[in-house]
């Protein structure tokens, strides 16, 4: 029987987590040109961001996605991890893919359907799959709507913890709590605390994180990896993006 090996990017994540908490930046190819993505990647690397995720809930694919991934790879040495909205969000140029299941979706397509449709493409391209439990928390924003999720109520941390633990027991090696891109508030600290207290795998928290202070509180509550996207994309200039990134990074690396 073939041995199940942990890939290079996942190993990189675990090794870094032994020393510090991590900061990933999410770039949405729908909203970011290849040129801007390349410049952002350079800034990310200079500021000590740990990886770049590429994807979005409305699902850029094909050439649009490829060009953004290639531009990031040309401008930085950071790992590029796909964060697909559906089975079309796969690029042969990426290093890894969060092979994720939206556990609290009402629609089986987002739990296992899209995954089955994308599996052979991941294998054919030789992209490293990283199994991840994806849990959408209120308000959920676009991803909650597109993914037909029943967002976890903000005042029900045990519900999120039950899903997270189920994900771990199903063999997923990361848990991601998502408040939704551009959410007015991040995932509640209490929810992060409760989820972290029951799982043994790294916890990623994303959505609505706009300041270093918010990042710091989430890290203190138990988040291992913070993901920011919209906060950077909404910046009017590269200089402003750099300032925002720096502020968030300082919150993560407390």
From Swiss-Prot:
Name the Gene Ontology biological process terms. Answer: glycerophospholipid biosynthetic process
Gene Ontology molecular function: any one = phosphoglycerol geranylgeranyltransferase activity
Any idea which UniProt keywords this protein has?
A: Cytoplasm, Lipid biosynthesis, Lipid metabolism, Magnesium, Metal-binding, Phospholipid biosynthesis, Phospholipid metabolism, Transferase
Cofactor(s) the protein requires to work? Mg(2+)
Provide the residue positions that the database annotates as binding Mg(2+): 28, 57
Q: Which family does it belong to?
A: Belongs to the GGGP/HepGP synthase family. Group II subfamily.
Task: List the protein's name.
Answer: Geranylgeranylglyceryl phosphate synthase
């Amino acid at each position: 029987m073939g041995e199940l090996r942990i890939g290079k990017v996942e190993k990189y994540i675990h090794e870094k987590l032994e020393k510090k908490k991590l900061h990933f930046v999410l770039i949405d190819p729908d909203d970011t040109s290849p040129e801007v993505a390349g410049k952002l990647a350079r800034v990310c690397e200079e500021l000590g961001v740990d990886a770049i995720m590429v994807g979005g809930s409305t699902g850029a694919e094909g050439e649009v996605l490829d060009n953004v991934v290639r531009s990031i790879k040309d401008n930085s040495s950071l790992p590029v991890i796909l964060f697909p909205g559906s089975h079309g969000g796969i690029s042969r140029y990426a290093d890894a893919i969060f092979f994720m299941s939206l556990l609290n979706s009402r629609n089986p397509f987002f739990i296992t359907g899209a995954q089955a449709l994308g599996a052979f493409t991941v294998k054919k391209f030789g992209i490293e799959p990283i199994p991840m439990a994806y849990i959408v928390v209120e308000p959920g924003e676009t991803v909650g709507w597109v993914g037909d999720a029943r967002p976890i109520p903000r005042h029900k941390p045990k519900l999120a913890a039950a899903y997270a633990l189920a994900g771990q027991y199903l063999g997923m090696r990361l848990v991601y709590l998502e408040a939704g891109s551009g959410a007015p508030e991040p995932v509640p600290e209490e929810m992060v605390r409760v989820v972290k207290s029951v799982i043994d795998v790294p916890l990623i928290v994303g959505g609505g994180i706009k300041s270093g202070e918010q990042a710091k509180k989430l890290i203190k509550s138990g988040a291992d990896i913070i993901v920011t996207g919209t906060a950077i994309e909404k910046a009017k200039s590269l200089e402003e993006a750099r300032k925002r990134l720096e502020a968030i990074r300082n919150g993560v690396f407390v």
